[in-house]
């Protein structure tokens, strides 16, 4: 009996264990399935989340790209507009420059034409003014330039003509040597060829006298003191110089320093009214005081140029020469570097005596320039050659007529052409 029960129990145990195993397996399978399901759900959720984030990121990037595209497009549009505007401005600038340059060229051409016309007009007046000197020389030189063979007789005849034309011995000797050298150098044979040789020799001699007055760029008045003998044309030259400087855009003030002659003061005042220029004068007092007051007035008024007249005097009048030295000293007190220019006015009619005058005034004052007047009324045009040879003080201006425009800067070439052509 006992063995029966024991065998039965042994048979029940494996069945129970198998059932438990199956139950455990089923439970494990269920749990595994649940885990897998959970994992699957988590994976799907994660995938969905990632997908959403990716789509959001893509959308954000796409928006940014669009914004960049729009910004770039806007910048390109603005750049194109700026380029078009710049191109328009460049074209406008080109047109403006072309117009300005065209106007400037036109003005320059007009100025050149006016200058050439003026030169021609002055050359004609100069030639007309030197008629007496030219006619005298032409008549005397007719035999020299008549076509004969160049020999010693011809040279002697030429030398005589030069001496009688007031060129003086020193200038004549210089010219004769120069002409001989040119004849020898160029192999000239005929008297007709002497004219060119003489013209070039005379030009080379008087060319150093051609030193136009150049006004400095300064805010201080430029003081010009004029001296000379009575009747040389100082006062008239001052009036013409005032007009000449005004034409250059300069303001001018006149000092009536010829206190010896009431007529001189009145004449200068008439020139002042004619040119609308202030004249400083005194009914009493000396020349130095008038000139001092004139410089002070010019400094106060911002005047560019002071033209100071002085009384006429002969170099032999020693007390008057001392007086004009005083005028110079007083001008230096009024302005340390004044007078900036000291000019003697010469009457061309006095011929060789002009050289002596220049020497005397130069020794007394230290001349910086000359004005040679009345060349139209004399046959002594050779005086410039004498001056060039003996005392070569620069000839600032020459006068060949009574007109207000008949006082001009000295041009050596124009003078020689007018004298010998």
Curated annotation (Swiss-Prot):
Of the GO CC terms on this record, one is: cytoplasm
Q: Does the keyword Aminoacyl-tRNA synthetase apply?
A: no
The GO annotation for biological process reads:
SRP-dependent cotranslational protein targeting to membrane
Task: Give start-end positions of Basic residues composition bias.
Answer: 1-10
Q: Name one GO molecular function term.
A: signal recognition particle binding
- What Pfam families has UniProt attached to this entry? SRP54, SRP54_N
Which keywords accompany this UniProt record? Answer: Cell inner membrane, Cell membrane, Cytoplasm, GTP-binding, Hydrolase, Membrane, Nucleotide-binding, Receptor
**Lineage top rank: taxon:** Bacteria
Q: Which Gene3D superfamilies match?
A: Apolipoprotein, P-loop containing nucleotide triphosphate hydrolases, Signal recognition particle SRP54, nucleotide-binding domain
Residues involved in GTP binding: 228-235, 309-313, 373-376
User: SUPFAM superfamilies this protein is in?
Assistant: Apolipoprotein A-I (SSF58113), Domain of the SRP/SRP receptor G-proteins (SSF47364), P-loop containing nucleoside triphosphate hydrolases (SSF52540)
Its EC number is 3.6.5.4
Places the protein is found: Cell inner membrane; Cytoplasm
Q: Which reaction does it catalyse?
A: GTP + H2O = GDP + phosphate + H(+)
Specify the signal sequence span: none
Q: List the disulfide bonds.
A: none
Its quaternary organisation is: Part of the signal recognition particle protein translocation system, which is composed of SRP and FtsY. SRP is a ribonucleoprotein composed of Ffh and a 4.5S RNA molecule.
* Function description: Involved in targeting and insertion of nascent membrane proteins into the cytoplasmic membrane. Acts as a receptor for the complex formed by the signal recognition particle (SRP) and the ribosome-nascent chain (RNC). Interaction with SRP-RNC leads to the transfer of the RNC complex to the Sec translocase for insertion into the membrane, the hydrolysis of GTP by both Ffh and FtsY, and the dissociation of the SRP-FtsY complex into the individual components.
Q: Which family does it belong to?
A: Belongs to the GTP-binding SRP family. FtsY subfamily.
Q: What is this protein called?
A: Signal recognition particle receptor FtsY
Species of origin reads Neisseria meningitidis serogroup A / serotype 4A (strain DSM 15465 / Z2491)
Tell me the organism's taxonomic lineage. Answer: Bacteria, Pseudomonadati, Pseudomonadota, Betaproteobacteria, Neisseriales
């Amino acid at each position: 009996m006992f063995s029966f029960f024991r065998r039965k129990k042994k048979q029940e145990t494996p069945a129970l264990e198998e059932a438990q195993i199956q139950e455990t397996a089923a439970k494990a399978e269920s749990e595994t399935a649940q885990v897998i399901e959970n994992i699957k759900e988590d994976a799907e959720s994660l995938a969905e989340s990632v997908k959403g984030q990716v789509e959001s990121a893509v959308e954000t990037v796409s928006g940014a790209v669009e914004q960049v595209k729009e910004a770039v497009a806007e910048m390109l549009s603005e750049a194109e507009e700026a380029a078009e505007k710049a191109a328009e401005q460049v074209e406008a600038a080109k047109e403006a420059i072309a117009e300005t340059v065209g106007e400037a060229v036109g003005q320059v051409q007009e100025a050149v034409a006016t200058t050439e016309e003026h030169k021609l007009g002055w050359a004609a007046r100069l030639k007309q003014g030197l008629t007496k000197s030219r006619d005298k020389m032409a008549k005397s030189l007719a035999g020299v330039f008549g076509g004969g063979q160049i020999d010693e007789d011809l040279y002697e005849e030429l030398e005589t003509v030069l001496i009688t034309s007031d060129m003086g011995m020193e200038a004549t000797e210089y010219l004769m040597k120069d002409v001989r050298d040119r004849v020898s150098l160029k192999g000239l044979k005929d008297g007709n060829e002497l004219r060119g040789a003489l013209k070039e020799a005379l030009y080379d001699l008087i060319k150093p006298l051609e030193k136009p007055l150049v006004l400095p760029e300064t805010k201080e008045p430029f003081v010009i003191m004029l001296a000379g003998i009575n009747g040389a044309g100082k006062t008239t030259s001052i009036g013409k110089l005032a007009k000449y400087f005004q034409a250059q855009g300069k303001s001018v003030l006149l000092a009536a320093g010829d206190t010896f002659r009431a007529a001189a003061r009145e004449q200068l005042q008439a020139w002042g009214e004619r040119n609308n220029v202030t004249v400083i004068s005194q009914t009493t007092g000396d020349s130095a005081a008038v000139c001092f007051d004139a410089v002070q007035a010019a400094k106060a008024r911002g005047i560019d140029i002071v033209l100071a007249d002085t009384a006429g005097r002969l170099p032999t009048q020693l007390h008057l020469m001392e007086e004009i030295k005083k005028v110079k000293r007083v001008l230096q007190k009024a302005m340390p570097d004044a007078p900036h220019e000291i000019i003697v006015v010469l009457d061309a009619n006095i011929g060789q005596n002009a050289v002596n005058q220049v020497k005397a005034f130069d020794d007394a004052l230290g001349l910086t320039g000359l004005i040679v007047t009345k060349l139209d009324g004399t046959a002594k045009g050779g005086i410039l050659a004498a001056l060039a040879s003996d005392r070569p003080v620069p000839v600032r201006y020459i006068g060949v007529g009574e007109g207000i425009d008949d006082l001009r800067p000295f041009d050596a070439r124009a003078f020689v052409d007018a004298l010998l052509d």
